[in-house]
Amino acid sequence: MRFHTLLFLSFLLLVSCALICTAQHPGLEKSGMFHENVGKGQHIEEKRSCIERMQTCGVEAGLPCCSGAPCICPYIGDCICIQ
């Protein structure tokens, strides 16, 4: 019985870590998404003129930050607009 409890708690720990990771790095989810217009090479970001604060602003988007701030790229994770 203790083994099953330990196994269940380990599973809950892994699931909670995965949920926290996707909450902190929403770009990881977006990279795996498929869109209806993939054949045209368009992305959702291309329909906007700029990227809002704390949204991803990587090279693939090619759009400036709305505030004029630079797109900051950490060592690990998505590039974001900071202001």
Swiss-Prot record:
Signal peptide (from-to): 1-23
SS bond list: 50-66, 57-71, 65-79
Cell membrane in keyword set: no
Subcellular location per the Swiss-Prot or TrEMBL entry: Secreted
Gene Ontology MF, one: toxin activity
Cellular component per GO, a single term: extracellular region
Domain of life of the organism encoding this protein: Eukaryota
Propeptide position ranges: 24-48
Major localisation: secreted
Keyword field contains Secreted: yes
Keywords: Disulfide bond, Ion channel impairing toxin, Knottin, Secreted, Signal, Toxin
Tissue and organ distribution: Expressed by the venom gland.
Family: Belongs to the neurotoxin 07 (Beta/delta-agtx) family. 03 (aga-4) subfamily. JZTX sub-subfamily.
Chain's role: Probable ion channel inhibitor.
Domain notes: The presence of a 'disulfide through disulfide knot' structurally defines this protein as a knottin.
Protein name as it appears in the record: U25-theraphotoxin-Cg1b
Organism: Chilobrachys guangxiensis
